[in-house]
């Protein structure tokens, strides 16, 4: 899908890091990734040989779900991040992680965003969910508990969520899809993977500096959309 001559601007070191990460993650995700991710990856036509052009990816995403990609130099604070979601835009960090951060990157980077998030942005169920989160965040006052809860909901779904598929846990959160270390930790038999419960998720503390203590698993992909109405009710009575 992508013309390589438009992608040569990335430094050789960045291209090498992309290639190594792409190979490792696609191998690890075999029969572990959610169908929505695998389908999105195939539709985008991402390749191991070179870093894709963000503008071309954005055009493909817009064609499928109406969303756009917004290149940024570094991760946003939650308020700016959710404001973009409310506009059906997703920020893409333009720097890629260093070699020493292969297994775990505490902050989003180019690989995390392009490989982990963008394939999922071709799924209308997820993009509708993200849009609702962005809109809901905008209605809550700065510094409110509700905003903290909305961040937790985003974190334990779009970043570290699991979904049950054919009786097995499948990964759909970008923090899992893009991190070998996080995958190994998640699939460890001693790591808790409780069923997704909105009230529990909203009050679970968020940490981005280490592997997660637990990963919430949707019993079905449709529950992600269904929880939007439940969330609206909770915020209205808060």
Where do the PLM segments sit?
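A contiguous, surface-oriented mixed alpha/beta subdomain in the mid-to-C-terminal portion of proteins
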Residues: 98-226
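The feature captures two recurrent sequence modes
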Residues: 1-121, 125, 201-203, 216-238
């Amino acid at each position: 899908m992508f013309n390589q001559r438009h992608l040569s601007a990335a430094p050789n070191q960045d291209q090498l890091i992309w290639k190594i990460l792409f190979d490792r993650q696609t191998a690890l995700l075999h029969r572990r990734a959610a169908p929505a991710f695998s389908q999105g990856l195939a539709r985008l036509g991402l390749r191991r040989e070179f870093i894709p052009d963000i503008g071309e990816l954005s055009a493909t995403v817009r064609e499928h779900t109406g969303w756009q990609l917004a290149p940024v130099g570094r991760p946003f604070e939650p308020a700016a991040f959710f404001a973009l979601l409310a506009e059906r835009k997703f920020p893409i960090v333009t720097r890629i992680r260093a070699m020493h951060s292969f297994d775990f990157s505490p902050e989003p980077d180019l690989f995390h965003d392009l490989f982990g998030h963008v394939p999922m942005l071709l799924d209308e169920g997820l993009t509708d969910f993200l849009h609702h989160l962005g809109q809901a965040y905008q209605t809550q006052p700065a510094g409110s508990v509700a905003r903290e809860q909305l961040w937790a909901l985003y974190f334990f779904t779009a970043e570290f969520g699991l979904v049950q598929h054919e009786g097995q846990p499948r990964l759909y959160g970008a923090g899992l899809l893009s991190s070998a270390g996080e995958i190994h930790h998640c699939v460890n038999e001693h790591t808790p993977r409780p069923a997704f419960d909105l009230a529990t998720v909203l009050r679970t503390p968020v940490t981005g500096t280490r592997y997660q203590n637990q990963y919430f698993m949707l019993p079905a992909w449709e529950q992600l959309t269904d929880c939007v109405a439940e969330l609206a009710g909770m915020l209205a009575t808060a």
